[in-house]
Amino acid sequence: MHLQNSDTQALELQANTLTWQAWQTFWASHLGKEVLKVEAEYLAPIMESLRGYHVLSVGSCPSKPLLENCTIKHQMEWRPNFDLAEHGSCLIADPSHLPLPNDSMDVVLLHHSLEFFDRPHALLKEAARVTLPKGELIIIGFNPRSLWGLTRLLPKGLQAEPLQVLKSAQFISQNKLLDWFEFLDLKQEERQLFFHRPPCNHQKPLERLAALDKRLGKKNWPLAGIYLLRIKKRVGSPLRPIVKKPSPSWLPAQPVSSPTRTSLKIQKEK
């Protein structure tokens, strides 16, 4: 076991920040806005059904539209650095070494983050570690067996600017995810496939093709562009971090009002 040296931490921070900023270009595009809108619609009933005290979002964009209907009031979200933290409930850390206790989160949302980071398996393991037994992980990602998966194979010069971020993204197959879930003692309980429109960044064609989503939206067509997974953490041996975590800086989250369970205490770094 060893501590990450300061040079490694600095490089990872810089890489995460640059990747985050590249994804913001995508989410600000016509296509990105439409994707986020549809994802929020599919997440809404799930968020309304959640129970617990603490939810953590690790993703490639601000989580406000995704957590809008969440019944869990104590909400934290990851950011790559302090400059990108909009409020006091942002967690600033290497996402594969979260400064959180084992079994401390009722729900962890991974929104396109397995595609975002260089070590998706390490991120998933860390998310599982901080999730309570019988807690939930919710994973949203792009389906590699779709037009979205084919688009990332195009030469960079043929891709529209908002889509260039997909070139470096890691599209992970369902079979590989199932292998990871088994290794981490996780059980997939629900899988939804949606967004049947091609990755086209033109507003009018996107609006015209919206009928495809209405026609195929609830059929889990295997070539749909986006998947949503609900994962349950089984009760078993606790997962431990691979290495001893450094002491990263983070902003403290606001405490939950009147909890019946001891609230998570995160101390501000001095």
Task: Please provide the spans of the model-predicted regions.
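A short glycine-rich, Lys/Arg-flanked "PGG" loop and its adjoining helix->strand segment in the class I
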Residues: 121-136
